[in-house]
Amino acid sequence: MVERYSALLIRWRWLVVLLTLVWVFAAASGVRFLSFTNDYRIFFSEENPQMQAFDNLQNTYNKNDNALLVITPKSGNVFSPEILNIVEQITKDAWQTPYSLRVDSVTNFQHTYAESDDLVVENLVEDALSFEPAQIERVKAVALAEPSLLNRIISPSGHVTGVNVTVHLPEIDPQAEVPEVISFIRGLADEYEAKYPQIEIHLTGILFMNNAFTEASQSDFATLVPIMFLVILVLVGLSVRVISGTIATLLVIIFAIISAMGLAGWVGIKLSPPTASTPTMVMTMAVAHCVHVLINFLQSYRPSQDKAQALTESLRINMQPVFITSLTTAIGFLSMNFSDAPPFRDLGNMVAMGVVTGYLLSVTLFPALIMILPVKPPKQTSKGLLFMQAFGNFVVVQRARLMWVMLAAVVTLVMFIPANELNDEFVNYFDETIEFRTDTDYITDNLTGMYQISYSLGAGESGGISEPVYLATLEAFAEWYRQQPGVLHVGVFTDVMKRVNRNMHDDQPAWYRIPDLRELAAQYLLLYEMSLPYGLDLNNQINLDKSATRMDVSLLSLSTNQLLALESRAQEWLHENAQSSMHGSGASPTMMFAHIGYRNVRSMLLGTVIALVLISMILIFTLRSLKMGTLSLIPNLVPAAMAFGLWGMFVGQVGLALSVVVGMTLGIVVDDTVHFLSKYQRGRREQGLSSQDAVRYAFSTVGMALWVTSLALIAGFLVLSLSSFELNSSMAQLTATTIMLALVADFLLLPPLLMKFDEMNRKGDVANARAQ
């Protein structure tokens, strides 16, 4: 069958090349439909309960998609006429931000005070350059005593201040809207830094986080793919030392990548940081298929042998294992469809398409190119082959010792798996080459936190937020939160009510408390709302029928476990101290990312089990042996377990990306096992070799190819570990580690197990013979 296929392929090689090019260009034409997404929500499915809770919050109150400009005077003091004047100007200009809803700063803070029987509401700062020192001191005293400003808009020491721009994106063209806002804000910051060298401006906010996803994706495309091409060229070139083979491999890689990307465009997949790693992954998979065909071709091709015969022999040896490894690899990546995060589903589907395309090209285009391009037969046995023969002999001689050493290493490393803990801090998804990360770290250290938990706390009836009992509970909840470690700021409606109540009692400090009567509180609220200017109303804090208020808690950069523990304690407090209408979970992007790791682990567990069952069935069917198929699972499951153990020893934190590694690598590491076992069984069945000699035969025929392909895979994922996006980087590091350990297991654990298995079978046969 293979011989006939090979003969047809060799005969019609030019037609094969032509048809392949037609297919590739048809698939690649879908690239025009690809676009980058700039929305963090892409990581969450429509069914995600945390996202649904956040959407409900956003629909109840004004959306809080924001851009925060943090101004740092080099003098270390915000409270001077010059700096306050700059803040005034930035505040005014920030209103021109596309889609802006409101702008909050220390200068336009709606300061209230009593004047006779009237409530005066005005900007805290107007015309700062005209201020006398006494006026500056008054502004400083008010700002640093105001809970709604401190650790949100102004630092306690007064050394930095922020201008927060809230926007409402129409979401008609999200790909253009976010960059439009980002471009405006960055232009504004650059303009003021150039105009006033005495200040520095740092930028953060939800919109900058959204934009960072796009920047990380584009950065990976621009840097990692070229590096990977160079690595593959050098690796394959040095390993096979055949220019035409290297060129053919390179063409297969390029066609596999553009086909995968084009097919993704045809099915409507959006590019995100995880899917931006597709070219690197497809490249490593495609090169593995080609190397197996090429190395066996070169081993068979001698001056005395026909080129076509050598290629036919290589295809005969590799056709089945290359198909099986492609199938198992595709299954491993398709298991990522069980992920709770859509970008990882997209990644799995894109790489699976690339793997299948790479397989088809490696058994059509690649051998056709080998026949077309000039290839000189090797003059002598390669040093790599001689080394593998010697190494195979070493493994056979030392099989007992190697088996026990490997088993001890496995047990030792597996013991460290519990040292890992789940942690998803979304700011740390980006490394420090991304401006969003460095600016956000600076702002967290100096002013306020990017991490936030928001609550919608119901009063149980329309207008109920003026009820003193409700307000007292709300105030107690806010005070409880302010006492918790890691909390920077709590924005709560009661701060407004206490301030207005004090104003209405001649600004006497003793009256800085909640009004005693509901009617009085309602009147104060109405009076205050009527005095507020356009764009600075309370719709970001209270709902339309005044039956609920929003409380925002800003946090330091807490770990996932710390964050979930804090929210759990908050729920306990609400259930013990608050009326039932106030019971509700915290909602925010922070909470969404905090839960996603746990949700993904649970969903991927099922995907990994299904992948394992399917791959096991394929191996048993391929090897035609239930015992051999079951035995082969040991070197396939052990590497991931060892890798997570190593990760627990040296890193100790796993997150969203690492929860897909087991399913993903399962299909990859099976490749080496399938190739080794297929050659082992070929030696046993076709050549009648003993178990020890069959191991030697497997090392001599496939050992070098396994070494090169594993090296290519490891190199590919190590290149991906240079990604500026931490999810890609950590996933790549763990995957590279898993593949390295898989090679070790296939070279040092699988052969001793095979020989031990054969020895046990022989002893069993002898015992049965004696019994008869």
Locations of the language-model features?
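Extracytoplasmic
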Residues: 55, 59, 85, 130-243, ...
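Hydrophobic, glycine/alanine-rich multi-pass transmembrane helices and their short helix-loop junctions
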Residues: 235, 323-366, 370-373, 616-620, ...
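Pore- and gate-forming transmembrane helices of large, multi-pass membrane proteins
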Residues: 223, 285, 289-290, 302-339, ...
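Signature of alpha-helical transmembrane segments and their immediate interfacial
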Residues: 1-36, 367-368, 376, 380-426, ...
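Interfacial segments of transmembrane alpha-helices in multi-pass membrane proteins
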Residues: 218-269, 339-342, 606-651, 722
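Hydrophobic alpha-helical segments
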Residues: 260, 264-375
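Hydrophobic transmembrane alpha-helices and their membrane-interface caps
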Residues: 245-293, 628-677, 718, 745-748, ...
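Juxtamembrane segments of multi-pass membrane proteins
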Residues: 398-521
